[in-house]
Amino acid sequence: MATPPKRRALDTVGEKVLRYEAFISDVLQRDLQKVLDHRDKVYEQLSVYLQLRNVIERLQETNHSELYMQVDLGCNFFVDTMVPDTSRIYVALGYGFFLELTLAEALKFIDRKSSLLTELSDSLTKDSMNIKANIHMMLEGLRELQGLQNFPEPSPH
């Protein structure tokens, strides 16, 4: 026996709803999580460079030729050490490369690198906002497809 047309329409609406929900959860939310994770890593890198800038600025202010410090060898195992010349510093350029720079050169590099990282984080923020807008649009489409009414937005107090 054939199913009535109204029943088939409900089945196709239900199938569309399931496909849209699967697209939202499998694609859009996964993409959003990847973008947000990448942005968090960029923020961590930016934080490290800003900490390095603070250290370099303190070194320039104190004008000491020697520096006594503790170095973490890993697993929170520290050793005391003495840096005989604080006029030059090794900076991680990326991809495993390090370069010996003067403090002024290191500050220039940090400024450039931090501006690039800030631009990248801004771009990733825009990407995440676009994905969130797509998710919202898909949810609105689902609401219309299911015939649900918009619920009033809670007013901020």
Curated annotation (Swiss-Prot):
It is found in: Cytoplasm; Nucleus; Cytoplasm, Cytoskeleton, Microtubule organizing center, Centrosome; Cytoplasm, Cytoskeleton, Spindle pole. GO terms for cellular component: centrosome; chromatin; cytoplasm; cytoskeleton; mediator complex; nucleus; RPAP3/R2TP/prefoldin-like complex; spindle pole. SUPFAM superfamilies: Prefoldin (SSF46579). Homohexamer. Component of the PAQosome complex which is responsible for the biogenesis of several protein complexes and which consists of R2TP complex members RUVBL1, RUVBL2, RPAP3 and PIH1D1, URI complex members PFDN2, PFDN6, PDRG1, UXT and URI1 as well as ASDURF, POLR2E and DNAAF10/WDR92. Interacts with LRPPRC. Interacts with androgen receptor AR (via N-terminus). Interacts with estrogen receptor ESR1; the interaction relocalizes ESR1 to the cytoplasm. Coiled coil: none annotated. It holds the Pfam family Prefoldin. This is Protein UXT. Involved in gene transcription regulation. Acts in concert with the corepressor URI1 to regulate androgen receptor AR-mediated transcription. Together with URI1, associates with chromatin to the NKX3-1 promoter region. Negatively regulates the transcriptional activity of the estrogen receptor ESR1 by inducing its translocation into the cytoplasm. May act as nuclear chaperone that facilitates the formation of the NF-kappa-B enhanceosome and thus positively regulates NF-kappa-B transcription activity. GO terms for molecular function: beta-tubulin binding; chromatin binding; transcription corepressor activity. Signal peptide: none annotated. GO terms for biological process: centrosome cycle; microtubule cytoskeleton organization; negative regulation of transcription by RNA polymerase II. Keywords: Activator, Chaperone, Cytoplasm, Cytoskeleton, Nucleus, Repressor, Transcription, Transcription regulation. It comes from Rattus norvegicus (Rat). Its main location: cytoplasm. The gene is Uxt.
